[in-house]
Amino acid sequence: MAGSWCVQRFAGRFCLRRDAERREKYLNSVLWMLFSGTEECAHCPEAMSSRDRRLIAEDIADLVDSTYWLDPAPLRRIVERQRRDVFLLRRIRRHGGYRRASYLHLLSRMPVDEKTVRAVERYTHSRNRYVRFCALSVQMMADMSALSSKIDAYSHRLSYFELSEVLRMLRQNVQPVDYEPLILSPNRNLRMLGLSVVWRFGIEDAEEILLRIVAENRSEESVGAMYVLCTLHSVITRPEVEKFVGGMNPVQRRVLLRYIARQGYSANALQVFIPEEEKRYYVSLVDSYKLNVG
């Protein structure tokens, strides 16, 4: 049994080393095609197996992930010429569940044409949430200018992880976005995306809108707006904030006040939110995050 384990371990390391060597070779070939202006993969004629085709697709995806303001047209021509999109679509059709989601995720990181976008549209209605979101990612990455309309048409709730992925796409594509229409949208996903944009990019001008959301006391958005206000280090000793925090359940309030303390707010800023019997605990909590320089 020990001998079998050693053989499997050695074989696994050998495959990883071989894949790394091939990926380096294929990446050099892709770069050569970009600089030479050709779409022929002349330097890797043996790339015929499905493993090799996936390695080339991963190289192209990593190249897109590692660059900003890259013209997608040359890479899109390479993808079409080498039929990497056809290969991935075939894999997506043949597999299901998380493996299908992984192929969709890989496809979302590559420049694809409108025909490919239409081919994955049906997967946005899958019962598997990972498949749904990865299919949506393909649509969004293909046309970032239509990101808001794609999310608006998406009929499922975006999780916080999925919202963070959308933010990553925005940063990668250096895509300008107006946060105010998002926050004021009737669509829940767009509102949460707007809050995420304000939080991620530290937009202090959104303070008035955030306070308005807190005052409206909408469960999910108001809690999110409170955390964003604290992240922006806004003044939180306001009547609307005090009223909202006072109406939170004890567990939510405790978590929020711990976050406020971590953001560097003083004990005085917390006084209006803290019940009398809990003041000693929160004063010691604030002191644990601050250094006495007296």
Where are these regions (language model features)?
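Short inter-helical turns and helix N-cap capping residues of alpha-solenoid HEAT/ARM repeat scaffolds
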Residues: 52, 95-96, 127-129, 155-160, ...
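Structural detector for internal amphipathic alpha-helices that build alpha-solenoid repeat scaffolds
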Residues: 62-79, 101-112, 132-142, 160-172, ...
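Amphipathic alpha-helical scaffolding segments comprising HEAT/armadillo-like alpha-solenoid repeats
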Residues: 44-47, 76-93, 113-124, 144-155, ...
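Extended, charge- and Ser/Thr-rich helical segments
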Residues: 261, 271-274, 280, 290
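Short amphipathic alpha-helical segments that mediate assembly, nucleic-acid/protein binding
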Residues: 27-28, 53, 57, 72, ...
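Long, contiguous interaction/recruitment modules in multidomain scaffold/adaptor proteins
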Residues: 8-15, 124-160, 167-168
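Single-pass alpha-helical transmembrane signal-anchor segments
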Residues: 1-4, 103
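N-terminal topogenic membrane-targeting module
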Residues: 7-96
